[in-house]
Amino acid sequence: VFAYRERMITRCHIKGDAPSVAVYSDCERYRYLLTREWAPAQGRALFIMLNPSTATEVQNDPTVERCERRARALGFGGFRVCNIFAYRATDPRVMRAAADPVGPDNDGAIMDSVPWADRVICAWGTHGAHLDRGARVAAMLRATGVDLFHLGLSKAGHPKHPLYIGYAVQPVAWV
């Protein structure tokens, strides 16, 4: 387990049938993890996306709602969201303008989440080109030997963001 550099705030809530946990930096500018589990024995999906928006342990934003519905449709009993940038912003331009959009403990949070998951779905979209972060995270993940999946690739080869991808699209191995 990674030794985090900052103090973390962990908040829990029961959202419907799913205990929910969110981990934030002590300043709350960063959200490192968001986890919902309703039947962990059924397996867990890890979505690695761009950056956190407004979702909390209590409420989904549109993207996290899509991830939850997709995880349920795929037969998983839980999911977690990590992001290649942990800075909380609704607009990628605001995230890109932040002094440290990655967050001091983000790599540790991502790497701690990989063994937690039964399937890792990369989905950060074309904004992953910022600071070459998408490629760096992909290399970090590939070094673990875990199989990576995506929901489609952009023309530039970035794993597509899930917000506008239909539920009929199945995760595909990212080789």
Briefly describe each language-model feature range:
Residues M95-V175:
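Glycine/proline-rich loop-helix segments at beta-alpha junctions forming the active-site rim
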Residues Y30, T63-V64, N106-D107:
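Amphipathic coiled-coil/heptad-repeat helices and related helical stalk/stem segments
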Residues Q59-T63, D132-G134:
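Residues at alpha-helix caps and immediate loop-helix transition turns in enzyme cores, especially N-
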